[in-house]
């Protein structure tokens, strides 16, 4: 475990991806350094999010940022993160301090979202603590697709993420 990572205050700089047709909202914790570098959600080359979600939806893997946005909207998937800002060391979710939540009503007041999913335990925990009291909507916790979560096989990820299909 790398303990040398310095904690820094990070703010979220991606707009939420959604439109009038979005049916589910998929929430991460916060963009990782790699995602901030690539300028889009789940941007680490070894993050399995885009692969598993496109496989579950029966579509080819979207490559560019524009492809990913179109893919999400076409499949009625809204994408955002639980946090607007926090102190974090690198991409280590367990190091998060002083979290500032995003206002989920930005999406929920405009769109009829049927289910909210968290892409990882920490995102679910932060949502339950900081967002659920305001939204009144439970979150369904999915396993993290981050490269740090290599204990879980692709088959297990696929099975877990298949749950989203019930709502699309």
Task: Show which residues each predicted segment covers.
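Internal catalytic-core helix/loop-beta-alpha segment
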Residues: 74-123
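Short, surface-exposed acidic-centric catalytic microdomains
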Residues: 34-95
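Short, glycine/serine-rich, charged loops/turns that create anion-binding
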Residues: 31-34, 84, 123, 146
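Short, hydrophobic/glycine-enriched beta-strand segments
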Residues: 23-29
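Alpha-helix N-cap/helix-start and coil->helix boundary motif
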Residues: 47, 123-124
């Amino acid at each position: 475990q790398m303990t040398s990572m310095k904690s820094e205050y990070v703010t979220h700089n991606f707009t939420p991806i959604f439109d009038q047709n979005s049916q589910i909202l998929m929430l991460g914790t916060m963009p990782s350094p790699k995602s901030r570098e690539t300028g889009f959600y789940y941007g680490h080359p070894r993050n399995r999010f885009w692969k598993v979600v496109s496989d579950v939806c029966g579509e080819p893997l979207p490559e560019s940022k524009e492809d990913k946005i179109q893919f999400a909207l076409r499949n009625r998937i809204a994408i955002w993160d639980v946090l607007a800002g926090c102190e974090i060391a690198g991409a280590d979710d367990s190091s998060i301090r002083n979290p500032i939540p995003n206002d989920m009503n930005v999406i929920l007041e405009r769109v009829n979202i049927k289910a909210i999913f968290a892409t990882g335990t920490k995102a679910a925990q932060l949502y339950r603590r900081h967002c659920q009291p305001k939204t009144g909507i439970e979150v369904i916790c999915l396993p993290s697709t981050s490269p740090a979560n290599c204990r879980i096989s692709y088959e297990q990820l696929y099975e877990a993420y298949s749950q989203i299909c019930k709502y699309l």
